[in-house]
């Protein structure tokens, strides 16, 4: 390919102001993507080649374990999503599905994921155990109405994803295939030149019994990973479990009531009363909004030195009611409080808050759903809000069971926690970028969409399902987070748009021009993925662009061309060798093979 005719380089001299993280900055500056609108990007020719190379790696690996590629519609009828009971959750409030009505008034959604459609198809095409197992996958554009698109392709409204779905006759067969896909994912990410870690994860809106995320560790990551140094445990903070540190016991001579004027935070109470946060129970009030406009006020308690994990809390609340939970948010809006609550001592709320604080005129449930974390319920003596402005209270032998509290794990595990009583190993923390996620869905969708098969005994059974996603465009950006320097991108050769770029310093020199064409054609004949920078720009401009776009190897043709010598520069490790042109191809192939075979 030639820059002048096939691959114009749209590089920028200045860093775009809207880009917050380095990978986003470099994708824009190097001309790989162009912003069309918030969270919407055009993939320019260089970027498309990266996407195609990643897709080819994915296809090769998935095909090797028996998966079959197809293409599903992006426009989904609402009826399918209503059958799975996900329509309202994905379209109401902060739901992420773009939705519309056609000329006849029928509702549709732009696909953020495809569980409903593939299950509907499976219900029509799979009818016997003899057809199982089966796994289908596709690579296509997905749409998500992100509240705050940011970080380029990391959190965009339109992105390219590989999503796969498997169908099985038994839970054991699903579990076995789930592990096989997990191994395939590790091969895929290694083949893309990435360093990844697999972590236990929350299944979120997709659902299912268990799931695993694949993370690229990077400072720009939005997720927190907790792990042990030995590798025995790793989990997303949303899912991670641990043992909290031991609390400091309260002194015996402390007064029952503490006057705490304007001390509304845990730290303020501790600083003014010589207390430790582990001696306090923090109370947070939230509103759970369900389908059918059912609203339940939540009173959640956690030890003062811990933080509530809203994902764990959401999942726990969702299991308590017949309706699907759509949203969970803190009660802090003044109008909401005045309309629904009375005599609420904000900042001084205790675990024994009376149900009478909920107004009779409110459309909320007329009692608090009370939930407490294990770390707090174990305290025999603690301080909490006194349900009276400017006062906290000492609670002794407070029976959470008798107060209708649900006791569970609703706290964030954190760095320094131990993973179990029998293991002294402490958790460490890193930031990560999720690039893959696999789920054991069980029978959640097959049951609701009536996808059944006939077993060996002729009995109709619900299909067992798995779901497997990879963010194709996320892989590209995550690779840049792990592979860049001050000058630009340093692509892993496996997914680089080209393996080598040829840079003649002066094409007006006939010797350089002839040698450039010879080398270029020789590379093409030997099926080397080569880009020729045949612009008449200054050499400095070409070098700067080459370093910015990050192609792994550069062949620099300069004054030594008269002696049939060129320079072979490796962008990855910044090494340069002078070499005769008759040894160039052999040396390049040898050096590039080392890169291809290098483990990430």
Curated annotation (Swiss-Prot):
GO molecular function, one term: aminoacyl-tRNA deacylase activity
GO-annotated biological processes: prolyl-tRNA aminoacylation
Function of the molecule: Catalyzes the attachment of proline to tRNA(Pro) in a two-step reaction: proline is first activated by ATP to form Pro-AMP and then transferred to the acceptor end of tRNA(Pro). As ProRS can inadvertently accommodate and process non-cognate amino acids such as alanine and cysteine, to avoid such errors it has two additional distinct editing activities against alanine. One activity is designated as 'pretransfer' editing and involves the tRNA(Pro)-independent hydrolysis of activated Ala-AMP.
Entry's localization field: Cytoplasm
One GO CC term, this protein: cytosol
Broad EC category: ligase
Similarity annotation: Belongs to the class-II aminoacyl-tRNA synthetase family. ProS type 1 subfamily.
Subunit field text: Homodimer.
Record note on domains: Consists of three domains: the N-terminal catalytic domain, the editing domain and the C-terminal anticodon-binding domain.
UniProt keyword terms in alphabetical order: Aminoacyl-tRNA synthetase, ATP-binding, Cytoplasm, Ligase, Nucleotide-binding, Protein biosynthesis
Reactions that this protein is recorded to catalyse: tRNA(Pro) + L-proline + ATP = L-prolyl-tRNA(Pro) + AMP + diphosphate
Cytoplasm found in the keyword field: yes
Cited PANTHER family: MITOCHONDRIAL RIBOSOME PROTEIN L39/PROLYL-TRNA LIGASE FAMILY MEMBER, PROLINE--TRNA LIGASE
Protein name stated in the entry: Proline--tRNA ligase
Short name of any one Pfam family annotated for the protein: HGTP_anticodon
E.C. designation(s): 6.1.1.15
């Amino acid at each position: 390919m030639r820059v002048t005719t096939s691959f114009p380089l749209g590089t920028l001299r200045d860093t775009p102001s809207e880009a917050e993280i380095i990978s986003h900055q470099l994708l824009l500056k190097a001309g790989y993507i162009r912003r069309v609108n918030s969270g919407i990007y055009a993939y320019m020719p260089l970027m498309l080649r990266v996407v195609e190379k990643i897709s080819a790696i994915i296809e090769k690996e998935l095909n090797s374990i028996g998966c079959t590629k197809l293409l599903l519609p992006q426009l989904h009828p609402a009826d399918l999503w209503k059958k799975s009971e996900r329509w309202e959750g994905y379209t109401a409030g902060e739901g992420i599905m773009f939705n519309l009505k056609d000329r006849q008034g029928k509702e549709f959604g732009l696909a953020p994921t495809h569980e409903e459609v593939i299950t509907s198809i499976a219900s029509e095409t799979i009818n016997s155990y003899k057809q199982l197992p089966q796994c289908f996958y596709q690579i296509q554009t997905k749409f998500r109405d992100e509240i705050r698109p940011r970080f380029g392709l990391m959190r965009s409204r339109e992105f390219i994803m590989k999503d796969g779905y498997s169908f099985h006759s038994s839970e054991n067969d699903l579990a076995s295939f789930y592990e096989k896909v997990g191994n395939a994912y590790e091969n895929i990410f290694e083949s893309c030149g990435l360093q990844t870690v697999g972590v236990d994860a929350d299944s979120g809106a997709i659902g299912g019994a268990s799931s695993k995320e694949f993370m690229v560790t990077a400072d720009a990551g939005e997720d927190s990973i907790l792990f042990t140094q030995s590798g025995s445990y790793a989990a997303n903070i949303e899912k991670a479990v641990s043992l909290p540190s031991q609390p400091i016991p309260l002194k015996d001579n402390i007064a029952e009531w503490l006057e705490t004027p304007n001390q509304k935070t845990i730290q303020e109470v501790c600083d003014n009363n010589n207390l430790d946060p582990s001696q306090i129970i923090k109370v947070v009030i939230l509103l759970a909004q369900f389908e059918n406009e059912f609203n339940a006020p939540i009173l959640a308690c956690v030890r003062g030195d811990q933080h509530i994990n809203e994902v764990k809390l959401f999942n726990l609340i969702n299991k308590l009611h017949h309706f699907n939970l759509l949203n969970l948010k803190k009660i802090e809006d003044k109008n909401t409080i005045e309309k629904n609550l009375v005599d609420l001592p904000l900042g001084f709320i205790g675990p024994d808050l009376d149900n009478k604080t909920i107004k009779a005129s409110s459309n909320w449930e007329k009692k608090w759903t009370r939930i407490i974390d294990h770390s707090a319920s174990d305290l025999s003596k603690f301080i909490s809000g006194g349900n009276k402005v400017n006062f906290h209270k000492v609670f002794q032998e407070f029976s959470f069971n008798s107060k209708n509290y649900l006791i569970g794990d609703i706290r964030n595990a954190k760095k320094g926690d131990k993973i179990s009583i029998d293991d002294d190993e402490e958790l460490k923390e890193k930031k990560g970028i999720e690039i893959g996620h696999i789920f054991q869905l069980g029978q959640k969708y097959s049951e609701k969409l009536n996808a059944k098969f006939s077993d060996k005994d002729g009995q109709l059974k619900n299909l067992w399902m798995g779901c497997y996603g990879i963010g194709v465009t996320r892989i590209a950006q995550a690779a840049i987070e792990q592979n860049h320097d001050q000058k630009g991108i340093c692509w892993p050769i496996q997914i680089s748009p080209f393996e080598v770029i040829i840079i003649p310093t002066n094409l007006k020199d006939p010797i350089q021009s002839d040698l450039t064409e010879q080398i270029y054609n020789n590379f093409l004949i030997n099926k080397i993925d080569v880009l020729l920078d045949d612009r008449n720009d200054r050499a400095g401009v070409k070098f700067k662009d080459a370093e910015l776009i990050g192609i792994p190897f550069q062949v620099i043709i300069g004054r030594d061309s008269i002696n049939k010598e060129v320079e072979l520069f490796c962008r990855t490790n910044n090494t340069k060798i002078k070499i005769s042109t008759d040894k160039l191809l052999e040396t390049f192939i040898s050096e590039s093979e080392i890169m291809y075979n290098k483990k990430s």
